[in-house]
Curated annotation (Swiss-Prot):
It is found in: Mitochondrion inner membrane. One of its GO terms (molecular function) is proton-translocating NAD(P)+ transhydrogenase activity. NADP(+) binds at residues 933, 965-970, 1007-1011, 1026-1027, 1042-1049, 1068-1069. It holds the Pfam family PNTB. The gene is Nnt. The keyword Membrane applies. This is NAD(P) transhydrogenase, mitochondrial. The transhydrogenation between NADH and NADP is coupled to respiration and ATP hydrolysis and functions as a proton pump across the membrane. May play a role in reactive oxygen species (ROS) detoxification in the adrenal gland. It catalyses: NAD(+) + NADPH + H(+)(in) = NADH + NADP(+) + H(+)(out). One of its GO terms (cellular component) is mitochondrial inner membrane. It comes from Mus musculus.
Length: 1086
């Protein structure tokens, strides 16, 4: 039994079962009470934890004795962190004085201040510099270390074998801070990077101190000061820190590195990357560059020799682990620099990258100041000590995560990037035994290049899996649902008038559908502008509900007056903006126009109606029909350049006839007519003023703002109609229908109003263009929709006025909020779809007014606008290979995205300067320019137009290729180019130009990224997979003009940047285009 009990409790961790296995059972009788007294001997203790309790360990922080070393291994904050962990900390008196950490701060942090010998005899000693001979005592610091103790310091074991032997005699365990593996998990302990960061920054500060001019360029009354030119060699931590500091001070920064990734980082900081013509990768181990071939070094020397003659300051950081620093700049190169220049050698401690460097010294050689200090981190001792202290405290906590005991295990078998990898790499000596270097870790990640299937191949496979039966069934189901819906409308129709109105709505929608499909994409912007103006017919609803005398006398009349006022803004402003855009498309060779003659049909239509009205004829319905047909003609006229001005004129005639018929049908008294005229005149004046002053580049935000007015007018009209009609609801059999339409119109108007305002804010730069992805936004939108739909129940069930107006107010608030949440979640790149959707919304709001007021004109015009906006939205979505729901709900990815890991882009890019670009342009005979939103933002259309004119005069074939979603609204780029005088007949759409790229000599990509991204066709896992793009990479040569190699709005890397036929011309679009145009002009004038 005793054996069984021992077996059961052998693994017990309860404190009650202590010493059961080792306790002797004494012979003889035992008293029961005695057994209870000795019950503790019957319970086992917890398993003993490995390691030593923190409270039994002392961490020592000695003063650094290396010459001019001002750093200290632990800051007071670091001491406090270790004391909190449980360590006892002792600091040598004065250890932190040079770092501005007096002894009192250490005492306050919980440390004890002791002498040098007591500190070095601690269990764990932390230092900056490796132990060395103390000249005062004439003894080595290692001799004072506690036997079998632990040392954490910079060691450099490969260069200091004698030191390792000395430490081995003391059986020391050594953690070398310079050997921390450069893996992701160890970034917080990487002291080399911390110190290099400080060295890079300090190098720029010292250079600025010894340089005789400003870093930044200045224009003063005394003259112009050019910016300093700085070359930084080495794109490691120090080099990038130098680049960032120099760039922030306004210098022109150039960076060189043999590694492509480092050059990319230079670019991200705004520095100009330099490369040699010879392509060779310099990627080495541990984050360092490897030694390059003889041919590469020769090309490198040639580049450096040229740069020495141009730059003012040289900063070099090139190191090779375990070896002397390479000499990159000869004495002749340095002497070729301008007098007063400065060179800073961050590799001085390893011999230096300059032949003229004197390690540890600052001196002047033939007018060139040389800074060869080897203690740059020490010259910022406070900051350096703080970062080094953070590295050590984080390392100690990471290698020994136990809360009570200090313990870590050194393994020779470990995986790459794990904590075992960090420990084994850092520990260079264990209990006196040298274990440096560490063995190679397992599972080093390797990228196996796998050529994925193209998007077209995957789409073909997907299409092959869908049977004809499924396709036919889907189509039949859609038509069945549509016809069933028509039958349902017939059943619920309250009267014949409703059925007639639905018929009008349906026919107008069909006409609008076929009319808008015929509009050329170049005229999509004028189309949206003219529909904006026509949607101002919400004024008809406002006029119908206005009342009072010179001023409105009731709430409903005030709402109606306000609706009329803001609708008039839309009418006048929309037509004037449309006319301005159409005037831009006129070519010098076009025949003269006599558009004033369109006053004849306008005057006949309106004047004839007034004559008929005076004669006692009531022909308002015919007027509405005529106005509706004119609006149809307006949309149809904008299908081609030749009839576009007629279309705008027909729109004006239609709106004028509709307003005249409305006033004639109402027959207001003179006082009310004055109120109506005043509201429309004021609104029209404001609209004309805005339209006259607006810049064409700001057209998208103007359209969005005008959409908001339509939505607000619809809300006001619906609420006013409810207030006016409420007294008649009890006697009107169709009152329920009126209430439903009023509720629906209020909801649509609210969404249109707020959504348009958010779109305006994003386009104008008032709000961030990035999508606002609220947590749980889909649930929030679903809740708002459910609340809006649910609100109709009390609205219809309770006949009281208070409930009705409250429900309308609530749905207007809910829909307004929903418009904000929906539109805020959509990024700037999707604004073309947002604007077209809002355009469609405004049309449906107008339809609701038409049903509400039983007005054929509003129904016809609303159906036209609604269908045109829907079709444009569909065109935009097809151009991005995305569904409308995906865009509206703030989604990402195309319908073809496979969802796997995106393809990694390999290779190097080629950069050219303006002279190279001019030469390529001169040699090309066929040129295509593909602009993007970058051209719009920079307003670079004018220099490009002038460039096109020059090239055309030289006999070159120059055309433009426009992507449907380039810009921030449909057709925006076409209008901007027309504004600059580019003939519209050389501006082609994507479908027209794509087949011509293989025969094109040169393509200029200006400010475009996603719309020319080949990943859409090459990478099935890309979030833009399957998106139709301009296939510019198929041309013979491509010049991409961008600010940087950064991604576009879709945040997708662009493979064309690294294709062999692509050259990058980086810089601001406007400045680059201006300079390019000037250079081309200069080249042809020679």
């Amino acid at each position: 039994m005793a054996h069984l009990l021992k077996t059961v409790v052998a693994g017990c961790s309860c404190p009650f079962l202590s010493n059961l296995g080792s306790s002797k059972v004494l012979p003889g009788k035992r008293d029961f009470v005695r057994t209870l007294r000795t019950h503790q001997a019957l319970w086992c203790k917890s398993p003993v934890k490995p390691g030593i309790p923190y409270k039994q360990l002392t961490v020592g922080v000695p003063k650094e004795i290396f010459q001019n070393e001002k750093r200290v291994a632990l800051s007071p904050a670091g001491v406090q962190a270790l004391v909190k962990q449980g360590f006892n900390v002792v600091v040598e008196s004065g250890a932190g004085e040079a770092s501005k950490f007096p002894d009192d701060l250490y005492r306050a942090a919980g440390a004890q201040i002791q002498g040098m010998k007591e500190v070095l005899a601690s269990d764990l000693v932390v230092k900056v510099r490796a132990p060395m001979v103390n000249p005062t005592l004439g003894a080595h610091e290692a001799d004072f270390l506690k036997p079998s103790g632990t040392l954490i310091s910079f060691i450099y074991p490969a260069q200091n074998p004698d030191l390792l032997n000395k430490l081995s005699e003391r059986k020391t365990t050594v953690l070398a801070m310079d050997q921390v593996p450069r893996v992701t998990i160890a970034q917080g302990y990487d002291a080399l990077s911390s110190m290099a960061n400080i060295s890079g920054y300090k190098a720029v500060v010292l250079a600025a101190n010894h340089f005789g001019r400003f870093f930044t360029g200045q224009i003063t009354a005394a003259g112009k000061v050019p910016p300093a030119k700085i070359l930084i060699v080495g794109g490691g931590v120090a080099g990038l820190a130098s680049a960032g500091a120099a760039k922030s001070m306004g210098a022109v920064v150039r960076g060189f590195d043999t590694r492509a990734a480092a050059l990319e980082q230079f670019k991200s900081l705004g520095a100009e990357p330099l490369e040699v013509d010879l392509k060779e990768s310099g990627e080495g181990q541990g984050g360092y560059a490897k030694e390059m071939s003889k041919e590469f070094i020769e090309a490198e020397m040639k580049l450096f020799a040229q740069q020495c003659k141009e730059v003012d300051i040289l900063i070099s950081t090139a190191l090779i682990p375990g070896k002397k620093a390479p000499v990159l700049f000869s004495k002749e190169m340095i002497e070729s620099m301008k007098e007063g220049s400065v060179v800073v050698d961050l590799a001085a401690e390893a011999g230096g990258n300059f032949e003229t460097t004197k390690p540890g010294e600052l001196y002047v050689h033939k007018g060139i100041t040389h800074i060869g200090y080897t203690d740059l981190p020490s010259r910022m001792a406070t900051q350096a000590s703080t970062l080094y202290s953070n590295n050590i405290t984080k390392l100690l906590k990471a290698i020994s995560p136990d809360k009570d005991n200090f313990h870590f295990e050194v393994k020779d078998d470990f995986d790459f990037g794990t904590m075992s990898h960090v420990i084994r790499g850092t520990v260079v000596m264990k209990d006196g035994k040298v274990i440096f270097p560490a063995p190679t870790p397992k599972n080093i990640p390797e990228e196996a290049p796998v050529k994925p299937k193209t998007v077209a191949e995957l789409e073909a496979e997907k299409a092959g899996t869908v049977s004809m039966y499924t396709k036919t069934l889907t189509t039949a189901s859609v038509y069945s649902a549509g016809l069933t819906g028509m039958l349902g409308l017939g059943i619920v129709a309250p009267n014949v008038a409703f059925s007639q109105m639905v018929t009008t709505f349906g026919l107008a929608g069909i006409i609008g559908y076929h009319t808008v499909w015929g509009v050329t994409p170049a005229l999509h912007s004028p189309l949206m502008s003219v529909t904006n103006a026509i949607s101002g017919l919400t004024a008809v609803g406002g006029l119908a509900l206005m009342g009072g005398h010179f001023y409105p006398s009731t709430t409903s009349q005030s709402l109606a007056a306000l609706a009329t006022f803001i609708s008039s803004v839309n009418i006048a402003g929309g037509f004037l903006v449309t006319q301005r855009m159409l005037d831009m498309f006129k070519r010098p060779t076009d025949p003269p126009e006599y558009n004033y003659l369109y006053l004849l049909p306008g005057g006949t239509f309106v004047g004839g109606y007034l004559a008929a009205l005076y004669g006692g004829y009531n022909i308002e319905e015919i007027m509405y029909l005529g106005s509706g047909l004119c609006c149809v003609g307006a949309l149809g006229g904008l299908s081609t350049q030749g009839t576009a001005r007629l279309g705008n004129a027909l729109g004006m005639i239609g709106v004028a006839g509709g307003l005249a018929a409305t006033l004639g049908g109402l027959k207001p008294d003179p006082q009310l007519l004055a109120q109506m005229s005043g509201a429309m005149a004021m609104g029209g004046t404001i609209g004309l003023t805005i339209a006259k002053r607006i810049q064409i580049s700001d057209l998208p935000q103007l359209v969005a703002a005008f959409h908001s007015l339509v939505g607000l007018a619809a809300v006001l009209t619906c609420m006013a109609e409810y207030i006016v009609e409420y007294p008649h609801f009890a006697m009107d059999a169709t009152s329920n229908f009126t209430k439903i339409v009023a509720y629906l119109g209020t909801y649509i108007g609210g969404v249109t109003f707020s959504g348009s305002l958010v779109a305006y804010g994003k386009l104008q730069g008032i709000l961030k263009s990035a999508p606002l992805l609220l947590p749980g936004r889909h649930a929030l939108n679903a809740g708002l929709l459910a609340a809006s739909v649910g609100g109709i129940i009390p609205f219809m069930a309770d006949p009281s006025f208070t409930t009705g107006i409250t429900c309308l107010g609530s749905v207007s608030g809910l829909s307004t909020l929903m418009g904000v949440t929906l539109t805020a979640a959509i990024g700037g790149a999707d604004m073309p779809v947002v604007i077209t959707v809002l355009n469609s919304y405004s049309g449906w709001a107008l339809c609701a007014e038409g049903f509400l007021l039983n007005n054929n004109l509003l129904t016809i015009v609303g159906a036209l606008i609604g269908s045109s906006g829907a079709i444009l939205s569909y065109i935009m979505c097809v151009a991005m290979n995305r569904s409308l729901a995906n865009v509206i709900l703030g989604g990402y990815g195309t319908t073809s995205t496979a969802g796997g890991k995106p393809m990694e882009i390999s290779g190097t890019h080629t950069e050219i300067n303006l002279d190279n670009a001019v030469e390529m342009i001169r040699e090309a005979n066929s040129i295509v320019i593909t602009p993007g939103y970058g051209l719009c933002a920079a307003k670079a259309q004018y220099p490009i137009a002038d460039l096109v004119k020059m090239l055309t005069e030289q006999g070159k074939k120059v055309r433009f290729g426009i992507h449907p979603v380039a810009g921030r609204m449909p057709g925006q780029l076409n209008v901007l180019l027309a504004e600059a005088g580019v003939p519209y007949d050389i501006v082609l759409e994507m479908d027209e130009i794509n087949s011509d790229f293989p025969d094109t000599d040169l393509v200029l990509v200006i400010g475009a990224n996603d719309t020319v991204n080949s990943a859409a066709q090459e990478d099935p896992n890309s979030i833009i997979a399957g998106m139709p793009v301009l296939e510019v990479w198929k041309s013979k040569q491509v010049i991409v003009m961008k600010r940087s190699l950064g991604v576009g709005y879709a945040a997708v890397d662009n493979p064309i940047f690294y294709k062999p036929n692509t050259a990058m011309l980086l810089g601001d679009a406007k400045k680059t285009c201006d300079a390019l145009q000037a250079k081309v002009r200069e080249s042809y004038q020679k």
